[in-house]
Regions:
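Residue-level recognition of conserved structural "scaffold" positions that shape functional pockets
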Residues: 17, 25-27, 167, 228
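Conserved alpha-helical scaffold segments that buttress catalytic/binding sites
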Residues: 34-84, 89-426
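Short, Lys/Arg-enriched N-terminal segments with co-localized hydrophobic residues
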Residues: 23-36
Length: 426
């Protein structure tokens, strides 16, 4: 039996909404303290080296709209919605080190594309030079991303190796609340010697990082024959999620709630099948299709929770006819389109206008409460925190879900996502 009504915002005050930093509510607001911080900011970057794009057809290109860091000009960051930048460091990518030169290869195709129709101010900061050590590169990336987040700008990072997930995650420390991460990777990048960081084990450093703000983690697209069963078992014990490639291919729409819940999303392009993206030493005959990649990129951009995203491991040295660079550029285009079309849903708004659906369940658990946004038709479910009196969490947490999970609960089954979240809150 179900009922629906308008949600009373006073009764539902999810942790994310109450603790969302004020700086993130006014996108583009540039606090005065950042003016002097930016004095040496662009010294970290090599200016953009993208070629001039012919406009003989009279059609605007991204090259005409983006504010790029050039040798003779710097972009205005005040009011910017998105900031792209590259990282010229692939030293921890092993035999895929050529990914260090990916940013310019991707820009070459991105700048030729027609901009999304709802274009918003976007900057291209240029490329962070490889530091004297890999840790120096990490420090530069972390400081840039942290400043962008505090300024209300969404950074999209073009790597470089997938190990750059580490400084992106560290940059979130300044936000000071529990964080959710999604990686898209054909492997689970754990294991090995944690003291020797590489693009194949960088998640060790993320999970063990202090202070530990990691609340939820999911990997999308792993392939069973590339995955250590012990790592899968570890993720299950931690109430984290690993979604197989087959599940993604069967229904890409089921991945949308996963990325909607993420503050940070990073993609290893080896998750794309080699026939669509050959430019990685780890490219495999199996993987996401080009269409899945672009759809996923749009889902990532559409998330109102997104703080930073990155696409890594593209190796121009292995790119047959630049097909891989074209695809990554198209993925960035879809991510931009998603960001420009965010709906301002939870956690950026009150849920007072959401529809509330109460589903009665048999057994000790009497009901699950679902919410539906009238702006986007997207769904959330309310997960109570059993020991909230002893913690800093509110009495419940709104977790993104799909309509199918609402149907599953209506038929008497407890959704896995609800149970995993409940276990973590307990």
């Amino acid at each position: 039996m179900h009922s629906h009504s308008v949600v009373n915002a006073c009764l539902v005050a999810p942790y994310e909404l109450r603790h969302w930093p004020a700086t993130l509510h006014s996108k583009g607001a540039l606090a005065p303290k950042f003016w002097f911080m930016l004095d040496g900011f662009f010294d970290l970057f090599e200016p953009v080296n993208a070629p001039d794009i012919s406009n003989a057809e009279g059609v605007a290109r991204i090259a005409d709209r983006i504010e790029a860091h050039r040798f003779d000009a710097r972009p205005m960051l005040e009011g910017a919605r998105v900031a792209l930048f590259g990282v010229n460091d692939g030293r921890r990518s092993g035999d895929n080190e050529g990914c260090a030169s990916a940013p310019d290869a991707i820009r070459n195709w991105l700048y030729q594309l027609v901009p999304p129709s709802d274009w918003q101010p976007t900057a291209d900061l240029g490329d962070i030079r490889a530091g004297a050590t890999e840790d120096d590169t990490y420090a530069a990336v972390q400081s840039v991303v942290a400043e962008m987040i505090q300024m209300g700008i969404v950074p999209i990072v073009l790597g470089g190796g997938h190990d750059l997930t580490i400084p992106l995650y560290r940059a979130l420390d300044s936000v000071g609340r529990p964080m959710n991460i999604v990686t898209v990777d054909p492997r689970l990048d754990f294991g090995g010697d944690p003291s020797i960081i590489s693009s194949r084990n960088h998640m060790n450093s993320v999970v063990m990082h202090e202070p530990n703000y990691l609340f939820d983690y999911a990997n999308v697209g792993h392939q069973g024959y590339l995955t250590d069963p012990d790592t899968l078992e570890l993720l299950e014990r931690l109430q984290f999620e690993a979604i197989r490639l087959g599940n993604l291919l069967q229904n890409i729409q089921q991945i949308e709630p996963v990325v909607r819940n993420a503050d940070l999303v990073t993609i290893d392009v080896a998750a794309i099948r080699a026939s669509d993206h050959p430019a990685s030493t780890h490219a495999s005959p199996n993987g996401m299709t080009a269409e899945h990649f672009c759809q996923l990129a749009r889902y990532i951009g559409m998330s109102d929770r997104l703080l930073v995203s990155g696409i890594f491991e593209h190796n121009p040295n292995l790119d047959d006819r630049s097909r891989g660079a074209q695809l990554v550029a198209q993925g960035v285009w879809h991510m931009l389109e998603g960001i420009f079309n965010q709906k301002g849903d939870h956690p950026k708004c009150s849920t007072e206008d959401y529809l509330k659906y109460v589903v009665d369940l048999p057994g000790e658990l009497h009901e699950i409460v679902f919410y539906k946004s009238p702006k986007s038709d997207r769904w959330w479910m309310d997960v109570p925190a059993p020991n909230h009196e002893k913690s800093k969490l509110s009495s419940s947490l709104l977790v993104p879900c799909s309509y199918d999970e609402y149907v599953e609960a209506s038929e008497g089954s407890l959704p896995d996502r609800w149970w995993r979240t409940y276990q973590k809150l307990a």
